UniProtKB/Swiss-Prot annotation:
This is Transthyretin. Sulfonation of the reactive cysteine Cys-32 enhances the stability of the native conformation of TTR, avoiding misassembly of the protein leading to amyloid formation. One of its GO terms (molecular function) is molecular sequestering activity. Belongs to the transthyretin family. The gene is TTR. Pfam families: Transthyretin. The lineage of its organism: Eukaryota, Metazoa, Chordata, Craniata, Vertebrata. It comes from Monodelphis domestica (Gray short-tailed opossum). InterPro entries: Thyroxine_BS, Transthyretin/HIU_hydrolase, Transthyretin/HIU_hydrolase_d, Transthyretin/HIU_hydrolase_sf, Transthyretin_CS. One of its GO terms (biological process) is purine nucleobase metabolic process. Thyroid hormone-binding protein. Probably transports thyroxine from the bloodstream to the brain. Residues 1-20 form the signal peptide.
């Protein structure tokens, strides 16, 4: 139990520390309502080249492809969507953890790490979904904020 609390505290602190990284964001960053950050807990570094898929639940209750991306050198993906397309609904972010660990020569337990969340049900918001990965576990957290003016 203490380990999980410490892990979540570490993930949250890494999320805020990583904002200090020398990432140059364009003026369009304020228009980025969904951002993803992925960290490698084993190496203590950003998880580079993690494939990420975003799905939106349809009225027929099926998951429809919404967006895709791959983490950059900072373990981040910006501009997965824009304000106009990112409406109210249920979304799933799927991290391809198997391919990430396999490329590093590690045989992981999980094929994917999924985060399912409801977006914009209380008004327009911006979401940062952060994932801390290891071969046999993962932890996620989210920062939900009002859009930047």
């Amino acid at each position: 139990m203490a380990f999980h609390s410490l892990l979540l505290l570490g993930l949250a602190s890494l999320l805020f520390v990583s904002d200090a990284a020398p990432v140059i964001h364009g003026a369009e960053d304020s228009k980025c309502p969904l951002m993803v950050k992925v960290l490698d807990a084993v190496r203590g570094s950003p998880a580079v080249n993690v494939n990420v898929k975003v799905f939106k639940k349809s009225e027929e209750q099926t998951w429809e492809p919404f967006a895709t991306g791959k983490t950059n050198d900072y373990g981040e993906i910006h501009e997965l969507t824009n304000d106009e397309k990112f409406g109210e609904g249920l979304y799933k972010v799927e991290f391809d953890t198997f391919s990430y660990w396999n490329a590093l020569g590690v045989s992981p337990f999980h094929e994917y790490a999924d985060v399912v969340f409801k977006a914009n049900d209380a008004g327009h918001r911006h979401y940062t979904i952060a994932a801390l990965l290891s071969p046999y576990s993962y932890s996620t957290t989210a920062v939900v904020s009002n859009p930047k003016d």
